[in-house]
Amino acid sequence: MKRWAALCSFCVLVFLVFLRVIWSAETELKPAPATYVGNEVCKACHAPAFEKFSQTMMGKIFLYNPRNETEKRACENCHGPGSNHVAAGGGKGVGGLITFRKDSGESAETQNNACLTCHQRGIQTYWEAGPHASRGLTCVTCHQLMEKTTDKNQLVKAGEKTPFFYKRAETEVCGQCHVQRKAQLYRSSHMPLREGKLTCTDCHNPHGTPNPSQLKQASVNENCYTCHTERRGPFLWEHPPAFENCSTCHEPHGTINDRLLKVSDPRLCTSCHNATRHPVTPRPPTSVFFFNRSCTNCHSQIHGSNHPSGQFFQR
């Protein structure tokens, strides 16, 4: 019995020694938690970058007019506490700092989380549920943090104004990826983005929304009614395609047809109204010139009518 007790005691002692060795090894391998060192320490090595940052909108807030303790950290507010970086003598990727270069190796989630520390409300509320986040885009894909820019959103593209067009910075940034939509803006009938009267963000929120196509409003029609209030109604006589979805007939970014129509009139109308003849004609049309006329010559109130005799949208 004594031998069994001694054996058990020995096994317990060996196990405790083993745990002690493992715990000591983990303690030695795990670096000490990093602490904040302050802006002046960063400036001592990164003077050119610090000078650039001080000229940006965000730099002016963090360095000269911080609103809370978090903003007072400035550099370390985005890159993280720098004590381990300083202790290791600096260098790219040393000390656990978050970096935002394209070749940094940081994941999109890590970079974006640094921004979302402050920018997680308002228009950024739905960022994590949006298509840009799910496709691995980072905030610095569109925004530049270390360069002075006249654009209030610190976008990576600058605007350009000439006598013939006005390239807004927002439109140029979106056009980097959405090349098909950018090309549509140069068609004969187009939204006035290339003239600078609208931007992509007048209709879309690139940071994400609970709505389709990242629309700012709950539906396509509600988005259109923001400007085209005369089309909202309510109407006594409703035209179902117009009531259900404006994009049934219109291509909002640009087309080769008048009034942003997807297909020229009357072919657009006959895609639904495909009877072999018009109700007021005794037989099918025999002249090609019939098809060169517009249905809206007679049915002018095609979006809807409140006239007592407006069943056919003629007035």
PLM regions and their residue ranges:
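Short sequence/structural segments immediately N-terminal
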Residues: 4, 16-315
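Bacterial N-terminal signal peptides that target proteins for export
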Residues: 1-12
